[in-house]
Regions:
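Gly/Pro-rich turn-and-neighbor structural signature
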Residues: 7-85, 194-230, 234-244
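TerminUS-proximal long segments
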Residues: 265-307
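Glycine-rich, often proline-containing surface loops adjacent to acidic residues and nearby aromatics
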Residues: 66, 92-95, 124-133, 179-200, ...
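Internal mixed beta-strand/loop scaffold within catalytic domains of large alpha/beta enzymes
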Residues: 53-127
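Short, Lys/Arg-enriched N-terminal segments with co-localized hydrophobic residues
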Residues: 1-5
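Long, charged, mostly alpha-helical binding arms that flank functional sites
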Residues: 152-205, 220-222
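Compact, glycine/acidic-enriched structural inserts
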Residues: 120-165
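An amphipathic alpha-helical core segment
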Residues: 165, 169-187, 222-267
Length: 307
């Protein structure tokens, strides 16, 4: 029998790990940026729990970024209990949520979320995901991003990458634009214990996903920060950031859950870019690098084999 199955896991162990993950990621981003310092705001949720919101603004590479930790508990609203199809109404949720918006249109936007959820009726599960939103798709970097994720997934289960990559393609999709938010990544939810996989093993997977964020993103920051760009690239960045806003306000489950459970609005909306633009009926010039990027924003791209 696998000894990992025998290990006990409770909400305090999970919460503690998430707190340290927030610390480590903030340190890595600050070190690579070279100028920015995260400002911390501690907050309490009236219904129970609270969190640590950490924001970096007007730094060297990062224009606006957030690394949020939260641990909330209380009574689950009826509407959400029905959506989650759970019987219990007392819930506990903890996790880390990250979004980085760089100044340069050549440094990609990145998002990661790792979370744990339990309900008084006994259900327990992990969820999360990591996805990359380049303003201009660099196939080699998209390939590297997916290779790192696939390697991490394969350490745990050879079906994870393909399953969770498809889930990300479907989830990070802006239906009214018929385009993906970026080059995707992985997305997963309701990862609980099964006959073959313990909750502890699920946690080990989530930890490994959390741990790849800093090495991957600091690499992209370093590689792309000094590439020159002009007004045209900044205009396209503002349009692509607008798409990011559309996804977050219309489709993002975390945004909906946070607002529906009286979460902290400023923390929930920290994923918003500092500036965005909605140029009416924007169409890129045929053959332009903007057109090339838009051609990549579709589901089922084999990013491992793309470059």
């Amino acid at each position: 029998i696998n000894t990992a199955i025998m290990k006990t896991l409770d909400r305090f162990v999970i919460t503690d790990w998430f707190i340290h993950l927030q610390d480590r990621i903030c340190q890595a981003i600050e070190k690579t940026d070279g100028k920015g310092v995260f400002e911390e705001e501690l907050w309490q949720r009236p219904g129970g729990g609270g969190g640590r919101t950490r924001i970096i603004q007007n730094a060297n590479i990062i224009e606006k970024g957030g690394v949020n930790f939260s641990q909330v508990h209380g009574v689950l609203p009826e509407k959400i209990a029905q959506q989650l199809q759970v019987k219990g109404h007392d819930f506990f949720a903890t996790g880390v949520s990250i979004v980085m918006h760089p100044f340069s249109p050549l440094v990609p936007i990145i998002h990661m979320n790792v979370r744990y959820f339990e309900v008084s009726s006994g259900e327990q599960w992990f969820g999360g995901g990591i996805d990359l939103t380049p303003i201009y798709v660099d196939p080699a970097q998209a390939q590297y991003f997916h290779q790192q994720i696939k390697h991490t997934c394969d350490l745990h289960d050879h079906t994870y990458y393909e399953t969770f990559k498809k889930w990300a393609d479907d989830y990070f999709f802006i239906k009214h634009r018929n385009e993906t938010r970026g080059v995707g990544g992985v997305f997963f939810d309701r990862l609980g214990a099964t006959a073959d996989i313990s909750l502890y093993q699920r946690f080990e997977f989530v930890k490994d996903i959390g741990n790849i964020f800093a090495p991957i993103y600091t690499k992209f920051m370093e590689e792309n920060k000094d590439i020159s760009y002009g007004k045209g690239e900044k205009q396209f960045q503002a349009i692509r950031r607008g798409r990011y806003v559309e996804f977050n306000l219309v489709y993002d489950k975390g945004t909906k859950f946070g607002l529906d459970t009286d979460g902290r609005t400023e923390s929930i909306l920290m994923s918003m870019p500092p500036e965005a633009n909605w140029l009416y009926n924007y169409q890129p010039f045929p053959g332009s690098k903007e057109a090339a990027t838009l051609a990549y924003l579709r589901k089922d791209v084999d990013w491992i084999g793309v470059a």
